[in-house]
């Protein structure tokens, strides 16, 4: 635990990106660990991530920091769509950081854990950036996107990379040739635990992610299983 040297009851802000549910779910074991070590946790989440974490931690205080709203394209490559959304993303990051400063002062925040929210760094407060995508994949703009990615990551005190450095499950996503200045691999994290259960279903699909791609993928999955017998 990065804040282990702090006294108990220090106030930690945990803020996952609302881009599917993966960012929120992988913050759950981190929040549980903070609570176990007697930290005071405050959560900032939006959309589906808010509803998931509110159900998981109904007793925890939530604060609102409007996040980046990236749109997935229906027809164009994601890299092209992302390029045209850069001004909107940068403006949203600016407002994230401006709002954060007010929240840090109002709630006396001692530490920040940001899961892929680029604007949640602070000069006077220790801040952690969580990611497994150091090298965002793009056919056309890989180097430019990585420079922007690292520009913001290096503003944080430390960058937690959610992967095992040796096993490297995420491949080039989490272990590119060039790494940010403040990276630290923290291994694999999940809120799920292994347990033996009676098999009820033959197939199980777990879908998440931003729209409209999530629904498009759901339609593909449903179409592909039509010929499978019970």
Model-derived features: where do they sit?
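Conserved nucleotide-sugar phosphate-binding/catalytic loop shared by glycosyltransferases and other
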Residues: 9-11, 17-18, 36-37, 41-86
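A nucleotide-sugar donor-handling region in carbohydrate enzymes
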Residues: 131, 136-143, 147-213
